[in-house]
Amino acid sequence: MSAYKRKRGSLPEVATNTKKAKKQLAGSEQEATAGEEFIVPPPVSEGKWKNKERVLIFSSRGINFRTRHLMQDLRSLMPHSRAETKMDRKDKLFVVNEVCEMKNCNKCIYFEAKKKQDLYMWLSNSPEGPSAKFLVQNIHTLAELKMSGNCLKGSRPILSFDPAFDREPQYALLKELLTQIFGTPRYHPRSQPFVDHIFTFSIADNRIWFRNYQIIEEDAALVEIGPRFVLNLIKIFKGSFGGPTLYENPHYQSPNMHRRMIRLATAAKVKEKQQVKEVQKLKKEEDRPVIPVDPTEAVFYTPAEEKPQVIETEPPAPKPKMKRKDKQFKRQRMAKKRM
């Protein structure tokens, strides 16, 4: 804009304020607004995260797809877990304690695969111990079961243990170890502040059976979610992944011995069948009881004339060939007939 020029002899114009004046509230309204305060609701988790349990879940190389899916299911159900790459078979088990220290974890679930068909699970309190070694059997993953139950990811579970865990000392030790590993710490940053599922550990046939159920709000019924697996205890060690043996399961049978027993049972069945066949063959070859001759059978018997026995000392003479060499084809013979 061009500058405004004032005319000669005229008074200067008073500057006008273009902004609108704010409406001033009355005294009573000002006091009412001053008394009102905007209150921000507090967070859902008012407590402090004190239990710093962290569980490292990983495996060795050579596991199959079912074990990998089970490992992923456990990671999704345990918000306080951490993952790690697979460990080489050449490395010894003491290396796991160093991995836990680097990952800032004080508990560990380690899956060890052997012969591409046997799966072992280590539950350890790193680095002091104790640790337990299990044989994992009857694995069923979440994707495989397709149960109707469901739970929110990150929610805290209720741990339910069989009463048999309090009767024997080795099971009491395992109960405390399982509680510290599978129990989600309260006020954990990744956890949800409510409970909607339950982990059950029951003892049957000298094994620990794991199940996961959803708690329905309406009638407090239980609906299974998954996964499923069975833990067959092998040994409990004083240290982490080694050390003096505190307990050894007398009922444990190694997978190699189990497969050997199956092969021996199959071989015994085959051998038994062969022996039965030989006995039946011997019975057939034995002399049968002599039946007395019936005299009426030879009534109509007529003896045949005895023919002299001829022994040929020379080969027979060759027969003459009657085949015509000048035999024409059928087509030529038919052509001659037409002519």
Swiss-Prot record:
SMART domains xrefs: Brix
Q: Which Gene3D superfamilies match?
A: Probable brix-domain ribosomal biogenesis protein
Composition-biased stretches (Basic residues):
320-339
What tissues is it present in? Ubiquitous.
Q: Which domain of life is it from?
A: Eukaryota
**Location (main, coarse):** nucleus
- Asked if the Swiss-Prot or TrEMBL record annotates the protein with the keyword Nucleus, the reply is yes
Going by the UniProt record, its keywords in alphabetical order are: Nucleus, Ribosome biogenesis
Biological process GO terms, please?
ribosomal large subunit assembly; rRNA processing
Please provide one cellular component term from the Gene Ontology annotations of this protein. Answer: nucleolus
The residues covered by the Brix domain are: 53-242
Instruction: Please list where the region (Disordered) is annotated.
Output: 1-34, 304-339
Could you tell me where this protein is found in the cell? Nucleus, Nucleolus
**Recorded GO terms, molecular function?**
RNA binding; rRNA binding
| Protein family | Belongs to the BRX1 family.
Role description: Required for biogenesis of the 60S ribosomal subunit.
Return the protein name.
Answer: Ribosome biogenesis protein BRX1 homolog
Q: Which organism is it from?
A: Xenopus laevis
